[in-house]
Amino acid sequence: MYNLKDMTLEEMEEFFVNLGESKFRAKQLYKWIYDKRVTDFDLMTDISKNLRAKLKEIAYISELKIIERRVSQIDDTVKYLFLLEDKNIIEGVAIKYKFGNTACVSTQVGCNMKCKFCASAIGGKVRDLKASEMVDQVMAIDSDYGKISNIVLMGSGEPFDNYDEVMKFIKIVNNPYGLKIGKRHITISTVGIVPKIYQFADEELQVNLSISLHAPNNELRNELMPINRAYPLEELMKACRYYIEKTNRRITFEYALIDGVNDKKEHAYQLVDLLKGMLCHVNLIPINYVKEIGFRKSNNEKVMMFKKIIENAGITCTVRRELGSDIEAACGQLRRKYLKEG
């Protein structure tokens, strides 16, 4: 059975041509699926009964089931657990900002990157998500939480480790017949898979790129993020500079501050040296406490010291507000708790 949500508009046009139908049927189906949110072919009244019958035999339109929904009493952040068709479980998050609602989307079940501070890494990667499963997260959050205007691929998983499905997902949500979310309202976050950064730069999309950096030198980054052993900082920075030159777009560097690990003055100065002259922004993140890992966030005094050093060097810097700390909104936390409790 074909899941129609796994098809870009061009793929769906080809699908209908192969059925002996006109390719304009694809736009009709896209409208039913993404505008009217209809999953029952019998309700698609501008499509002939014969074609509806044929579609029921060979295709379906997926939906995600919400199995848990936690609302933060602090900031209205909502954490979702979704049940996939194969009974795997993934997380999504809805975040309210002044400029609109953001959906934080997972790209894999679990993650293989083994970052030492991340709950998603505990247990490793189970499998990649299909484009439809990413689309369904956005649509489920949109239906439950309210209109989604921004997407961040910062949930569980490494987007560039599932590159082709992520690119397909972007095409579907960005399509004017799809979810109509502008590319500049979509952000991809990567730990730094260098060949994929070059490939992504060459796509010349207007999608935002965020790099999970978290350490200013190779020794510390090797310890915190094993990906650095494959692609050390020199290679990562070279790829980032290529991306900026190719796209003329700013990169955001994410830096999770961990008490006593990467939050010293020397680390801030090393970070400044690393990013000097780049079109970039630094986003400091107070890390979420994960019991199995044991890292704790830096205190406010250290965060402000770190921020001041970066800003004094002429690099823009913000501190991300803590989101959903009362509902285990960090990557992988709620899923792991749910699986442990059975």
Curated annotation (Swiss-Prot):
Classification via InterPro entries: Aldolase_TIM, Methyltransferase_A, RlmN_N, RNA_MTrfase_RlmN, rRNA_lsu_MTrfase_RlmN/Cfr, rSAM
Disulfides per UniProt: 104-331
Residues annotated for S-adenosyl-L-methionine binding in this entry: 157-158, 189, 212-214, 288
Keyword Metal-binding in annotation: yes
Alphabetical GO biological process terms: rRNA base methylation; tRNA methylation
Coiled coil: none
Recorded superkingdom: Bacteria
Catalytic class of the enzyme: transferase
Enzyme Commission code(s) on record: 2.1.1.192
Compartments where located: Cytoplasm
Pfam families xrefs: Fer4_12, Radical_SAM, RlmN_N
Cofactor binding remark: Binds 1 [4Fe-4S] cluster. The cluster is coordinated with 3 cysteines and an exchangeable S-adenosyl-L-methionine.
Signal sequence residues: none
GO cellular component, as recorded: cytoplasm
Keyword Methyltransferase tagged: yes
Cofactor(s) the protein requires to work: [4Fe-4S] cluster
Reaction catalysed by this enzyme: adenosine(2503) in 23S rRNA + 2 reduced [2Fe-2S]-[ferredoxin] + 2 S-adenosyl-L-methionine = 2-methyladenosine(2503) in 23S rRNA + 5'-deoxyadenosine + L-methionine + 2 oxidized [2Fe-2S]-[ferredoxin] + S-adenosyl-L-homocysteine; adenosine(37) in tRNA + 2 reduced [2Fe-2S]-[ferredoxin] + 2 S-adenosyl-L-methionine = 2-methyladenosine(37) in tRNA + 5'-deoxyadenosine + L-methionine + 2 oxidized [2Fe-2S]-[ferredoxin] + S-adenosyl-L-homocysteine
UniProt keyword list: 4Fe-4S, Cytoplasm, Disulfide bond, Iron, Iron-sulfur, Metal-binding, Methyltransferase, rRNA processing, S-adenosyl-L-methionine, Transferase, tRNA processing
UniProt miscellaneous comment: Reaction proceeds by a ping-pong mechanism involving intermediate methylation of a conserved cysteine residue.
Family membership noted in the UniProt record: Belongs to the radical SAM superfamily. RlmN family.
Protein's recorded name: Probable dual-specificity RNA methyltransferase RlmN
Organism: Caldanaerobacter subterraneus subsp. tengcongensis (strain DSM 15242 / JCM 11007 / NBRC 100824 / MB4) (Thermoanaerobacter tengcongensis)
Gene from which the chain derives: rlmN
